[in-house]
Amino acid sequence: MTNSQQQKYNNPVSATLTGIRDLFRKQIPAGTLNPTDRLDGKTVLVDGASSGLGFAVATGLARRGAKVIMACRSGIPEKGEKVKKLSGNTDIHMLHVDFSDIGSIGELVKQIKVKYAPLDILVCNAGIVPKQSRKTKQGLEEMFMVNYFSKFIFLNLLLENQCFNEVDPPRIIFVASESHRNPEKFQWDEFGKYKEYQIGKSIELYGYYKLLLTTFSCELSRRLNPNGETRYSVFSLCPGPVNSNIAREAPKIFIPVLKLVFGIFFKSPSKAAIPVVYLAASHDFDGKPFDYLFLMSRKTVDEKASDPENGRQLWKLSEALQERLQTV
């Protein structure tokens, strides 16, 4: 990887320009999302669903007949009512969760197990880009927790509590980013350690945590499908640059410019949701243990993310961190 490639997502300006450029690149679609790709009778959970991409995904899945559970930190119940109106589907439910808090994740899983399991589709969408480092209740760095580690905890709790459909292969979808290609290497010695940073470092760390997430998705697929049989379909994707509120913590001086650029060049959440809905609903992915999309095009993930040794190391460190936090 060249130095210029490494810098693509390392600051807000280069990340924005890269996003705009990627939108204009010619793409070969993996397939087409058809009106007949229905989800009637399926139970879907979308996290981070109160706004932006997550809200659009929840609405899109509801329109296809799914029973939709929106797991959110805010927007309860008004966002669920809005999805009902937009989709014409009344089978919409909202659950509270704060993905920066391990205890809140545990409570969410308890509610899912009692009232909503088995899940057929899970969309892990929640993510943040904070303007500076913040500590969680457990003393972790918040973006590390929300953008990666919460997914590890959440997925393993769902699996331990048998919250997925065990008859038909469920689909687990991670909203990742092409910025996962930017980090030069893993920083295993720093894993889980709290470190101070300001907005200038946020974009770089965002890409690093997306690398952790994409590596986790690859390793999860290998562990859930050990003998070549697809028991779970694990998908990851970059929806491209989205006109959402993920940059809401940017310095105030930049917000008017960002809003203008996002509005002109970036995709609306409803358009950006199409590849997520495609992965959730299309028969094109039946029987597939893993796939990665950029927009609507199939791509291979970065070799660092697909390397089984890196996957095993990430899993080992994540398990050790979870065990340590449980004994505190």
Where are these regions (language model features)?
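Context-dependent free N-terminus signature
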Residues: M1-N3
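Rossmann-fold NAD(P)H-dependent dehydrogenase/reductase core
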Residues: Q5-A15, D22-R248, R324-V328
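Alpha-helical packing segments of well-folded alpha/beta enzyme cores
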Residues: G60, L108, F216, A272-V276, ...
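Intrinsic disorder
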Residues: F99, R134, F266, A305-E309
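Soluble or luminal CAZymes and related metallo-dependent hydrolases
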Residues: S104, S150, L212, S268-K271, ...
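C-terminal helical subdomain
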Residues: S236, L260-T300, P308-R312
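Mobile gating loops/cap/lid regions near enzyme active sites that modulate substrate access
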Residues: P251-K252
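C-terminal amphipathic/interface module of NAD(P)-dependent oxidoreductases
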Residues: E303-V328
